Amino acid sequence: MSLENVDPQIPEGVTVSAEDAELLKFLETSKPKIYVVGAGGSGCNTMARMHEMKIEGVKLIAANTDVQHLVKMRADKKILLGKKTTRGMGAGSNPTVGEAAAKESSEEIKASISDAMMVFITCGLGGGTGTGSAHVIAEQAKAAGALTIAVVTLPFASEGKIRLQNALEGLNKLRKFADTVIVIPNDKLLSIVPDLPLNTAFKVSDEVLAGAVKGIAELVTKAGLVNLDFADLRTILSSAGCAVVGIGEASIEAKPDQRALIAVDTAMNSPLLDVDITSANRALINVTGGDDMTLKEAELIVSEVSKRIDPSSHIIWGARVEKLAKKSSIRVLIVLAGAKFPNYELAAAATVAGRQQEAELDLDLLG
């Protein structure tokens, strides 16, 4: 039997036995059904970035109360939340309205993910639709039996106290239903790219969220040097609570014997790892690189991570050669769970107070 009748990943013209053909058919039907739901304006923007990335093996769903924004999205499915509640005019930055809209559309949400094995929910917490709908979507995903992972941002301190308070309330609701909530504080992104205009900073935020989802999903949807299956992923991410993500890359200029360490150091020292990493007791690691990446380098990265977190941690990892990766580059995605999380409300208050003090000092200098 030729490839085109069995599996598009087998080179054309290659034949397989009847037994292998049966196995390949079973593999195709047993692939985990993975969905990404972008909730609200920010979540849909992140989902749009994922569409550009062409994440393998996932279906993209855009869910929003703003019909004008929704119609511009490229997705496998679009859900206009709360047709009666908002009439397609948005939630007005009110999470209560966003929640009501999602509940009105709960049957459509349920039907869209009824066969899911894993559901990612992306949104920017703090606004109306994403904040209000994320936990409703998560509840439906859990009811369907899916491993439910939320990847969310917390607002910039400059967006104000009310938006932060909305975000924290939304986060608490989301944690009740999602297995894992990966939290990315936008203010931490500023420490990576401090001089970017706000609009560009939001795009960086989309890139980080999309990259996190891609890195996790493709651990099970793409073959690699070291493969993981869906059961491995569930072991680490089921009922994991809040988690953080670190991303690191060694440039092509790095020396071959140092690039693995540079990549893991960058990931483990990422400002996005906003926790005491020594207390983390679960880790998910995805290592990708060019065709000159070795298995030994991947193992070195895993070894370095294990040295820096709880010694009794449960670690799973995968490694894959990316055809489009820059030669001599290595990229590491690390998801850490089980660590003690900071009090975001106190941290944000301190940030605001610090900026206010800086402004007062500037005024004193002007005077």
Model region roles, listed by residue range:
Residues 2-367:
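Tubulin/FtsZ superfamily GTPase core signature
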